[in-house]
A protein has these predicted regions:
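Extracellular adhesion/carbohydrate-binding repeat motifs centered on closely spaced tryptophans
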Residues: 1-63
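Bacterial extracytoplasmic/cell-wall-associated proteins, especially those involved in peptidoglycan
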Residues: 65-169
């Protein structure tokens, strides 16, 4: 009941999410398995066959809810926001932490990187809500080169583990 505006271009009306263009015309979002519940976004993870709660920034941050931001770009942004002052080793550890959550056998964590990063109730990564991640998503990195190097290295280590059983060290 009522309208809850989440961002200048997104609103939830009676549990249905709409996107508004610059002229104010509303379009019902389709193909997305999510609903707005208070300050959280309830998302259905088809792989885990389970619902998870995301922070409202899931809809507010451009390219996240619709999946337009690639896993690599999101992971690099998280690495820089969480551990930008810790060099490649620290950033790679952050990336591996996110990636490891995607294969949690107990399904306490979602199966997609964007879902893990934005998971709420409780908040998994404070950089989602404190503005640090959004800053990186807008291109303002502290150490872009090392963030991408760490994200790529972690993705390779993780892929080798999942596909070949190679240790994640």
């Amino acid at each position: 009941t009522g309208v809850r505006v989440l961002f200048r271009s997104i609103a939830s009306i009676d549990g249905t999410t709409y996107r508004f263009d610059s002229d104010g015309a509303a379009t019902k979002t389709s193909g997305n398995d999510y609903t707005v519940e208070g300050k959280y976004v309830k998302v259905f993870d088809a792989k885990n066959n389970k619902y998870y709660y995301m922070e409202e920034e899931f809809l507010e941050h451009p390219g996240i809810a619709d999946g337009k931001v690639s896993d690599l770009d999101l992971l690099a942004a998280v690495c820089d926001a969480e551990a930008g002052d810790q060099g490649v080793v620290g950033m790679e550890a952050v990336a591996l932490c996110v990636l490891n959550c995607t294969i949690d056998q107990y399904k306490e964590f979602p199966s997609q990187i964007r879902y893990v990063v934005y998971q709420g109730k409780p908040t998994q990564y404070a950089v989602v809500t404190d503005g640090a991640l959004l800053k990186r998503l807008k291109g303002q990195f502290e150490d872009r080169t090392n963030a991408y190097a760490a994200a790529k290295a972690a993705m390779e280590v993780f892929s080798n583990y999942v596909n070949h059983g190679t240790k994640r060290t």
